[in-house]
């Protein structure tokens, strides 16, 4: 349903290569792993296919309409409290809330897919469509495009994450050869979901870091009121001591504090206390949590049979694993942006 239209011609949004070997693989057009469940999602899918340039405006309008519908329903319920229609309007409000949440999640997912569209990277579809004889290969890797959305410091952290994951799979999986990995399907899905969370976490950290740098720079030119008060009290004390012939030395505690040290991102992150670390890692909304679960489920499991066979192993090369992990990290970063944008228009549920 989520299809892609390039600048020059109409193409499938999701074009991947599946097969045991790159030379006998063939391209195929497939849908995104998660299909829309609401009219709003289906409508945006059509725009993404035929008129992607108008999708952001259409999504914003849908968000406004859903916000208005939810408010109107709640107002009718509040007005009916104490009347015979109280229970009816409460039930209507609950149903409307559920409908709106599903529609909001569809809109958020489409906006994430649109962000992948803008960097010309197709989302990997359900892996069952790409696996042949338990072997998965994804080509091209799209490494350059997926890395292009991150700054140099973040990219360094991401590469450390990728290296640690690949080494872990090598160390814990059955030994085949140095260029082939084998991982259980359930483990694979957990690593993918964890990488989405890592991308979300990195986006949260970089945003917080940037804001603190701006604050530190502003304080350098415009000292905070606490510092000005300390300066004033220090001056008063000095004048009093001079008036009675006392010492004119200013205590070290009253001297101007040094400007906040502008750490690099990794040093800044390593300095987090447990509370700050938890705050940055925690998903802000239930909708974001639901999307990660739904997207991962749609990618790794086609039906209940797949879920009941978690020990099924997947064979793949390091480049295919790296492709999926980079996609997951980008998904988490895009999710943070989309969640922040949507929450400004339609208040999401706190997680």
Functional labels for PLM-detected ranges:
Residues 1-24:
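N-terminal chloroplast transit peptides
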Residues 21-351:
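Long compositionally biased, domain-poor regions of proteins
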């Amino acid at each position: 349903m989520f299809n892609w239209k390039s600048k020059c011609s109409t193409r499938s949004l999701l074009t991947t290569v599946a097969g045991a070997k790159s030379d006998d693989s063939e391209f195929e057009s497939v849908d995104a792993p998660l299909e829309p469940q609401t009219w709003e999602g289906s409508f945006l899918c059509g725009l993404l296919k035929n008129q992607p340039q108008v999708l952001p405006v259409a999504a914003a309008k849908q968000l406004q309409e859903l916000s208005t519908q939810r408010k109107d329903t709640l107002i009718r319920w509040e007005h009916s409290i104490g009347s015979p229609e109280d229970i009816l309007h409460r039930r209507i409000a609950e149903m409307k809330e559920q409908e709106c949440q599903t529609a909001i999640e569809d809109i958020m997912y489409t906006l994430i897919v649109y962000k992948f569209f803008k960097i010309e990277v197709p989302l990997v579809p359900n892996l069952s469509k790409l696996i042949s004889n338990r072997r998965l290969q994804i080509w091209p890797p799209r490494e350059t495009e997926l890395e292009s959305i991150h700054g140099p410091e973040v990219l360094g952290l991401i590469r450390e994450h990728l290296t640690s994951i690949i080494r872990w799979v090598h160390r814990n999986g059955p030994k085949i050869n140095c260029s082939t990995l084998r991982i259980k399907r359930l483990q694979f899905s957990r690593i993918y979901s964890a990488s989405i969370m890592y991308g979300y976490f990195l986006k949260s950290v970089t945003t917080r870091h940037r804001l603190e740098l701006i604050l530190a720079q502003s304080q350098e030119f415009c000292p905070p009121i606490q510092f000005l008060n300390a300066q004033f009290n220090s001056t008063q004390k000095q004048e009093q001591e001079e008036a009675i012939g006392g010492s004119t030395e200013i205590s070290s505690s009253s001297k101007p504090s040094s400007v906040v040290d502008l750490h690099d991102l990794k040093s800044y992150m390593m300095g987090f206390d447990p509370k700050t670390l938890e705050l940055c890692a925690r998903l802000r909304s239930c909708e974001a949590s639901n999307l990660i679960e739904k997207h991962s489920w749609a990618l790794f499991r086609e039906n209940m049979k797949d879920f009941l066979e978690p020990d099924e192993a997947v064979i793949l090369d390091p480049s295919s694993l790296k492709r999926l992990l980079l996609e997951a990290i980008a998904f988490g970063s895009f999710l943070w942006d989309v969640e922040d944008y949507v929450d400004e228009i339609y208040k999401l549920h706190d997680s």
